[in-house]
């Protein structure tokens, strides 16, 4: 095929194997010996630290770099901050469970409040500047989980935010905290 990568990639992407899902949709899961579905794995400390820092970043700061060098510098800075955050997390093993220390750190740490849930130059600031609740939820979900919210999630969060409209910033901090500490964020699927 004269090393036609476009043709090869197209063949892979359109294959039945590529179209399969790695999560079991319903019913009883098959035995692990069949390798029918992927096992969720916890992210390594560096992966999780970087994922949190990238999720907390203002998406507009990454969307419009002045030069490629500016973007590379910004990404390197975010990765370095992720490495610093990673020191707080346990290295996962086969029997990994989120530690009590990690849960308490996310619940009580000033670093989490300032670095991940702060307003200036962060996702929270961008969400609060965005017009319309649906668009705000979309920005929050795309930045943290790389997907749009489901209709059920949208309905639940609409009720949650409506009940806390007197402290909009605090309510959105809680929403972002919940997304960043969710199992969907912590585990590789």
Regions found by a protein language model. Give the residues of each.
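An acidic, gly/pro-interrupted, aromatic-rich
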Residues: 6-7, 14-150, 174, 179-189
